């Protein structure tokens, strides 16, 4: 949410560490309920399509976890999703806020109402079709520059004009 942007500018380590910790703990708690040890690869992104500050993670999670016998166990909630997305969103927000409050109590109190005003959305995608798809996805987020050449429409002495997707519309 936008409420963490000013904190991300002034206390970036706090925000970024909290994103990773809350994500991992959320995933682990859902896995534990199904008696699975989960895994995750997470990549931090600090900007959005419009190049505005938008700290968020892109996480790749296997379609299951390791059970108490050391065996991989596939798991699905409904359709192709591992866990219920609305529940993930609620638990993630609670864990993020709890950790932020512990690390930066004064700032947390300043933005607390904004953090709880709207629901948070954990975006989930259907599973990748192949290992190649996983590598391509990771490549887009680990080797990406802010404005790739295909988005640039014009450049002059003072301006760069580029295309972007407005995800809020």
Residue ranges and their predicted role:
Residues 1-169:
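Beta->alpha loop/short-helix hinge microenvironment recognizer with preference
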């Amino acid at each position: 949410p936008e409420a963490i942007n000013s904190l991300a500018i002034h206390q970036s380590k706090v925000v970024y560490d909290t994103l990773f910790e809350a994500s991992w703990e959320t995933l682990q708690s859902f896995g534990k309920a199904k008696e699975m040890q989960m895994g995750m690869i997470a990549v931090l992104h600090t900007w959005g399509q419009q190049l505005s500050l938008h700290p968020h993670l892109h996480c790749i999670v296997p379609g299951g976890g390791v059970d108490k016998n050391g065996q991989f166990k596939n798991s699905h909630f409904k359709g192709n999703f591992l866990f219920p997305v609305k529940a993930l969103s609620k638990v993630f927000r609670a864990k993020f806020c709890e950790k932020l409050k512990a690390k930066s109590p004064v700032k947390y109190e300043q933005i607390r109402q904004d953090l709880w005003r709207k629901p948070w959305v954990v975006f989930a995608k259907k599973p990748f079709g192949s290992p190649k798809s996983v590598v391509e996805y990771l490549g887009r987020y680990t080797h990406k520059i802010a404005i790739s050449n295909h988005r640039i429409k014009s450049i002059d002495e003072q301006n760069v004009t580029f295309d972007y997707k407005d995800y809020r519309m």
